[in-house]
Amino acid sequence: PEGFRALYAKQGDSLITQGFICADASGKTAILGRGGSDTSAACLGALLGAERVETWTDVPGMFSANPRQVPQARLLSRLDYEEAQEIASTGAKVLHPRSISPCREARVPLWIRDTSRPDFEGTVIGPRQAGAAAGVKAISSKSGIVLVSMDGIGMWQQVGFLADVFERFKRHGLSVDLIGSSEANVTVSLDPSDNLVNSDVLERLCADLAEVCRVKVIAPCASITLVGRGMRSLLHKLSDVLAAFGRERVHL
């Protein structure tokens, strides 16, 4: 970081650089993929120990729900790093989840600003505030995800079963998003935005998993996530939420 700051200092008061472009382990030019510009800005800000990182986009910040789907969604003016990470990871597209970690580790605030309303404060993401009350901050959703359900009586308390299963996902280059488990079932979700999930890949994965369990693919699916602090302490207050899932016959 010190060498980087010294290099930056030689450039004068302002440095204009590109995002999205990086180098791989062998030093060859590569691209960071979706959200690469957000990630570049966050990494540069963290390395420089910047006062803040500002991401300018076409929306004023993060909302309590998708405003295109929920017109009464509220703009969230303040979030801590963990809350923002969860909202971004579970469906919000305004900020890539990968861009939050560098700022969190360097304790650099991250601001989301609106290019069409430059005087608007937007959303400020920073350290958790002391005494933050438990509560639901946002509802996020993802669509088009793939569920892989794995059943087997023998999996209960079988040493190494999950390690064996996830090794097979790794073998096929698949990263798991959400996980649900019971005594005789493990269900995981695959996000197509982070994985190459086509019929050929799923067919090979199922053939591999069939060696250790019964497997079923369910797609397309959607996930709905409640994001907040101290959620376990609020379970007794979420009866209306759970009832809404029941009315719509949504599996939990």
Residue positions per predicted region:
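C-terminal catalytic "cap/lid" subdomain
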Residues: 1-252
